[in-house]
């Protein structure tokens, strides 16, 4: 499975909706799909499944607001 699809699969599991796959520009926090607990879960899953460590200092909610932005941020950290 390609990197992009892996990230979207993780997001779909955490948000419990396929809307994140259908609309990769959806505002995850504004729509209530991600909160602080789900964000922690997301970062743990990213590290576990993709072997990418996201330093807390690198996590800026504004830069991680949509699935597309998350993919871009993770690509930069690979």
Swiss-Prot record:
GO terms for molecular function: D-alanyl carrier activity. PROSITE patterns: CARRIER. Keywords: Cell wall biogenesis/degradation, Cytoplasm, Phosphopantetheine, Phosphoprotein. Carrier protein involved in the D-alanylation of lipoteichoic acid (LTA). The loading of thioester-linked D-alanine onto DltC is catalyzed by D-alanine--D-alanyl carrier protein ligase DltA. The DltC-carried D-alanyl group is further transferred to cell membrane phosphatidylglycerol (PG) by forming an ester bond, probably catalyzed by DltD. D-alanylation of LTA plays an important role in modulating the properties of the cell wall in Gram-positive bacteria, influencing the net charge of the cell wall. 4'-phosphopantetheine is transferred from CoA to a specific serine of apo-DCP. InterPro entries: ACP-like_sf, DltC, PP-bd_ACP. Pathway: Cell wall biogenesis; lipoteichoic acid biosynthesis. The keyword Ribosomal protein does not apply. Gene3D superfamilies: ACP-like. This is D-alanyl carrier protein. Belongs to the DltC family. It is found in: Cytoplasm. The lineage of its organism: Bacteria, Bacillati, Bacillota, Bacilli, Bacillales. One of its GO terms (cellular component) is cytoplasm. SUPFAM superfamilies: ACP-like (SSF47336). Residues 1-78 form the Carrier domain.
